[in-house]
Structure formats: structure tokens, C-alpha cells
């Protein structure tokens, strides 16, 4: 996730939001999520990388707290 001077992240509509939260397209995915894997009962599915994917495909904060590029 990219930040503008450590103080803002890109929010909805590719406008800068408060806090260093990345794109903001998936607000429920911006916080860390813990999960438990029980092996041997079902196939192991690792959903922990969803947050990385959501942030990587969105906006990045550029200079002067503007979003660059705007891909939301």
C-alpha cells in the first residue's frame, strides 16, 4: 500500500482519504484478518493474500496527496 507522506491513502472514488489505508476499494479488507486452518478435514484454502491483491490493483497516492494512477 502506498501513502502520501505517511498521512493519507486513496479512498473511494480515487480521492485521498485519511489514514494510511491504501485504495479503500475494499474497506473490510484493509485491516488484518486472522483465520484458523484445520488440516485434514478439508482442502487448505489460503485467503490471506486477498488484502494484497485488493491494494495492488487500486490507487496509489502520488505527490501532493493525489492518486496516481487512478485505477479504482
UniProtKB/Swiss-Prot annotation:
The entry lists its GO molecular-function terms as:
metal ion binding
Domain of life according to the entry: Eukaryota
Keywords assigned by UniProt, alphabetized: Metal-binding, Metal-thiolate cluster
| Expression sites (tissue/organ) | Leaves and roots.
Q: Which family does it belong to?
A: Belongs to the metallothionein superfamily. Type 15 family.
Q: What is the role of this chain?
A: Metallothioneins have a high content of cysteine residues that bind various heavy metals.
Can you name this protein? Answer: Metallothionein-like protein type 2 A
Q: Which organism is it from?
A: Solanum lycopersicum (Tomato)
Amino acid at each position: 500500500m502506498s501513502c502520501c507522506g505517511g498521512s493519507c491513502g486513496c479512498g473511494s472514488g480515487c480521492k485521498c482519504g485519511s489514514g494510511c489505508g491504501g485504495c479503500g476499494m475494499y474497506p473490510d479488507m484493509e485491516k488484518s484478518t486472522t483465520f484458523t486452518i484445520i488440516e485434514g478435514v478439508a482442502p487448505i484454502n489460503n485467503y490471506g493474500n486477498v488484502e494484497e491483491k485488493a491494494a495492488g490493483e487500486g490507487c496509489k497516492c502520488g505527490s501532493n496527496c493525489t492518486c496516481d494512477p487512478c485505477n479504482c
